[in-house]
Amino acid sequence: NEWHRKNDPDNRLISRATRFRMPSMILRDWALANAGLLVSKVGGQPVYPYQPDKVWEALAITKEINFDYPAATGDDLYRRSIYTFWRRTVGPVNMFDSSDRQACRVKPGKTSTPLHALTTLNDPTWIEASRFLAEKIMLGTKETSDRLETAFRHVTAQTPSVAKLSVLERAYDEQLAIFKQNPQEADKLLAIGEKKRNLKLPALEHAALTQVCLGILNLDQSLTRE
């Protein structure tokens, strides 16, 4: 604002900057942290979080062809991305903007490729994070409108406008109607990820709120450092 421009023209207070999409590894950690799943343990061996089967096979060379990805369990699934195992020839598939490892880079690149959405909308880490975020909100609030407002504020640090809240409510109602017609799909959604869901919560409402939370996590204002 004008006060900062006048009193801090050199931005020594770091009070302003251009907006940018956060790097993939930061986004993964951010999603886990929003859900309360991020493990803060420091140090240790590399970990092997969720990854599609044989996704590295086409890029393998020589003896790497026989490499079997030893999928992690327990807390290792939720460690910070800095501990994720890297192959010599290719990085984790959920980090589209990571270094190509052909040359040294002092900072990560940033991307807005549409392929990024394949991860943020479908990766088990993101779906599980959305599920736990929804669970946490359902345990703390009762009314649907309160739950949606809480989810939006929790992720974006902003209070939703009446128009935005109306969109969230409409999205929730649509998802709830879909799951009422196909309750087995709600069970499938809530089964994604290693951690078990809270069976005390109604499955249909939990699944609908999970989908809305996933949408909120994928908003531009969520994925972008303002």
Language model segments and positions:
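C-terminal structured "cap/appendage" subdomains that terminate the fold
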Residues: M138-T210
